């Protein structure tokens, strides 16, 4: 017996609700957690604390965008935390020891991070190596180089222009927030409004169909990992400006925060599914949750447990909603 139009509409609405819950269900749970934290700590949702969180999440936000692109193509980039350290060490060495102008130091550091991203993409695209293996191995290489460059010692930076990148404000808005907003706009336009963005979704959604339609998988993959390296370099610039020191041991575990924010924002490990607005939501939720747990005195050990559970929950929902693609 044929279904009535009302029945079809009801089924369609149920599917739509199920899809939304599947994509953002873990986010809803975390929003409830934020409400509970706000009740426990009245300062949590004050404008001052929100601005503080927005300033701090700029670093993880830039890393998240790189992970978003890599995951959307069906890959992963585990080097972003190590890239923070390497870029920081290059900036510190060229500025603190060689006396280069601050701007050239930033160009050198971010340039090296971008180059390593290019190499990652080249190895993955040219030799069909697994992204996990390539980026995990390169993570070790980059960490080692960071230690070699600095000898494991911190390099203090006193250049006021450079340290002002984190501490200065423009029209009353902290510079890290301005940088994050500008990069967010660029990433949104690139991913959702350009041919390259469509190619990223095509390669992640069905690589064989993408190649058959004329899309160059090679340049898409190389481009994605190069951009991820560039964003990691910019994130390191902000981080190093914040701390006023270049260190080889920074960024450990930062890739997991970026992955959590990306997946929480709806980026699918199945590939071909992602939105920049979703990433922004994930970035803010992760930042607010960590900030809230700090404010109510939750141990860092328990915070690590929460972080792991968030990633597992988000990936489980992703697997359920995209079981056919997986």
Feature names for model-found ranges:
Residues 16-17, 76, 114-155, 190-195, ...:
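Short loop segments and helix-boundary regions at transmembrane helix junctions
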Residues 232, 242-308:
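Transmembrane alpha-helical segments in multi-pass inner-membrane proteins
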Residues 1-35, 212-219, 293-326:
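Cytosolic-side transmembrane-helix boundaries in multi-pass membrane proteins
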Residues 26-39, 67, 139, 143-144, ...:
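Hydrophobic core segments of alpha-helical transmembrane domains in multi-pass membrane transport
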Residues 100-109, 115-120, 124, 171-246:
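Helix-loop-helix "hairpin" substructures at the membrane interface of multi-pass membrane proteins
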Residues 32-98, 122-129, 266-276, 309, ...:
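Single transmembrane alpha-helix segments in multi-pass membrane proteins
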Residues 23-28, 53, 60, 82-86, ...:
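Hydrophobic alpha-helical transmembrane segments
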Residues 127, 131-194, 220-223, 242-251, ...:
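Transmembrane helix-bundle core of multi-pass membrane transporters
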């Amino acid at each position: 017996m044929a279904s009535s139009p009302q029945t079809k509409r009801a089924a369609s609405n149920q599917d739509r609700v199920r899809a939304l819950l599947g994509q953002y269900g873990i986010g809803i749970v975390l929003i409830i957690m934020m409400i509970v934290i706000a009740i426990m700590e009245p300062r949590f949702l004050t404008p001052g604390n929100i601005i503080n969180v927005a300033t701090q999440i700029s670093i993880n936000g830039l890393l998240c965008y790189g992970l978003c692109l890599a995951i959307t193509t069906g890959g992963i980039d585990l080097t972003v935390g190590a890239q923070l350290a390497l870029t920081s060490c290059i900036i510190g060495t060229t500025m603190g020891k060689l006396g280069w102008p601050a701007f050239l130091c930033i160009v050198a550091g971010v340039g090296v991070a971008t180059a390593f991203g290019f190499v990652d993409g080249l190895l993955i695209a040219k030799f069909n190596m697994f992204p996990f293996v390539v980026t995990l191995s390169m993570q070790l290489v980059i960490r080692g180089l960071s230690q070699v460059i600095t000898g494991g010692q911190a390099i203090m930076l006193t250049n006021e222009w450079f340290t002002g990148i984190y501490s200065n404000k423009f029209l009353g808005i902290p510079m890290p927030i301005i940088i994050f907003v500008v990069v967010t706009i660029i990433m949104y336009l690139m991913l959702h409004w350009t041919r390259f963005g469509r190619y990223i979704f095509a390669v992640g959604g069905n690589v064989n169909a993408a190649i058959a339609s004329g899309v160059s998988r090679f340049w898409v993959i190389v481009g994605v990992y190069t951009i991820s390296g560039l964003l990691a370099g910019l994130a390191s610039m902000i981080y190093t400006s914040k701390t006023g020191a270049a260190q080889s041991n920074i960024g450990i575990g930062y890739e997991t925060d970026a992955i959590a924010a990306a997946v929480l924002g709806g980026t699918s490990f199945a590939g071909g599914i992602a939105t920049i607005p979703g990433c922004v939501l994930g970035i803010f939720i992760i930042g607010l949750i960590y900030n809230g747990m700090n404010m109510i005195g939750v141990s860092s050990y328990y915070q690590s447990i929460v972080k792991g559970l968030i990633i597992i929950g988000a990936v489980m929902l992703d697997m359920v909603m995209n079981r056919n693609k997986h």
